[in-house]
C-alpha cells in the first residue's frame, strides 16, 4: 500500500519533461529549409539538363550529323597594295592646307609633325594610322563613302574604255581664221561619243564634248607621278587632272 502511494506521488513532469518553445521553432525552421533546398536542387538540376539537351539537339541535323559552326567572315578590308598607293606625307610639307585641317576619324586637327595619308580618289586627308585601321574593315572613304574596292574601280575603268573612241591627231598647215606662220603648226583633235564624268565625292562635272573638233596650238599630253603633297597641290593648281590610277596625274598644257 505504501509502494503504490509512493509511485502515485511522483510528479508527471519528471517522467515526460516538457520541450521549450525556442527549440521547437528552430527544429521546424531547419526542417523547412531542408525541404526547400531539396526541391530547389531538383528544379535546378532539371533546368540544367533541359538546357544541355536543347543545346545538343540544336547542334545536330535531322540526319544526326553535327552542325558545324560557321567560320568567321574573311577580311573585308581594302587591299594593302591599294592602301600603299595613296601618298603619305608630313603635314608640315603642305603649303596649301585647303584639303582639310582635321582628321575625320579621330576628329583631331592636323599638326605639322603628323603623318597624313591622302586618298587621291576623293582628295580627303587622314592620319596615316587612323586611315590604315579604317581600311582593315572598310573599302570606302570615311567621309564621302567613295568606293575604293579594286573590283569596283576596275569595272569603272573597263566601262570608261568602252565609252570612248580612238582620238585621231593630225597636223594641218592652214587655218581659215588665221594665216599660217613660219615654224608653227596646228593640230586637229577629233573626238566623238564621249560622256560625262563626275566626281561622286564633290559633285563636280567634267564635260566632254560630243562630235566636237578641238583646235589647239602645239598642245601636248603629259603624264607623271607624284609622291609629295607639294607636288599634288602644284599640279592641281597648274591644271593637272587625275586619270583612273590614284598615283598618276595628267594634264593638257598649252
Curated annotation (Swiss-Prot):
It is found in: Membrane. The RING-type zinc finger domain mediates binding to an E2 ubiquitin-conjugating enzyme. This is RING-H2 finger protein ATL28. Belongs to the RING-type zinc finger family. ATL subfamily. SUPFAM superfamilies: RING/U-box. It is a single-pass membrane protein. Its EC number is 2.3.2.27. One of its GO terms (cellular component) is membrane. It is an enzyme of class 2 (transferase). GO terms for biological process: protein ubiquitination. The chain crosses the membrane at residues 25-45. It holds the Pfam family zf-RING_2. It catalyses: S-ubiquitinyl-[E2 ubiquitin-conjugating enzyme]-L-cysteine + [acceptor protein]-L-lysine = [E2 ubiquitin-conjugating enzyme]-L-cysteine + N(6)-ubiquitinyl-[acceptor protein]-L-lysine. PANTHER family: RING FINGER DOMAIN-CONTAINING, RING-H2 FINGER PROTEIN ATL28. CDD domains: RING-H2_PA-TM-RING. Pathway: Protein modification; protein ubiquitination. A zinc finger (RING-type) spans 103-145. Keywords: Membrane, Metal-binding, Transferase, Transmembrane, Transmembrane helix, Ubl conjugation pathway, Zinc, Zinc-finger. GO terms for molecular function: transferase activity; zinc ion binding. SMART domains: RING.
